[in-house]
């Protein structure tokens, strides 16, 4: 993808990047390991964004 992007697309890509993080360690500890992963994790090669 080129480096020149419209602002709207850039904002959507940034949001998707922020959402694609693992569950924080303090949450895993707080829930005693019940919450280990979140199902909306996206791997860049498998699932493509509609951005």
Swiss-Prot record:
Q: Which GO terms describe its biological process?
A: translation
InterPro entries per the UniProt record, alphabetical: Ribosomal_eL39, Ribosomal_eL39_CS, Ribosomal_eL39_dom_sf
Gene3D superfamilies to which the protein is assigned, alphabetical:
Ribosomal protein L39e
Q: Which is a Pfam family this sequence falls into? A: Ribosomal_L39
- A GO MF term: structural constituent of ribosome
- List keywords of the entry alphabetically: Ribonucleoprotein, Ribosomal protein
UniProt cross-references to NCBIfam families, sorted A to Z: PRK01242.1
Q: Which family is this sequence assigned to?
A: Belongs to the eukaryotic ribosomal protein eL39 family.
Q: What is the name listed in the Swiss-Prot or TrEMBL entry for this protein? A: Large ribosomal subunit protein eL39
Origin species: Methanocaldococcus jannaschii (strain ATCC 43067 / DSM 2661 / JAL-1 / JCM 10045 / NBRC 100440)
Name the gene behind this protein: rpl39e
């Amino acid at each position: 993808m080129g480096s020149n992007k419209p602002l709207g697309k850039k904002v959507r890509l940034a949001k998707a990047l922020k959402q694609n993080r693992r569950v924080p360690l303090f949450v895993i500890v707080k829930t005693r390991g019940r919450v280990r992963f979140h199902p909306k994790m996206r791997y860049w090669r498998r699932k493509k964004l509609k951005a």
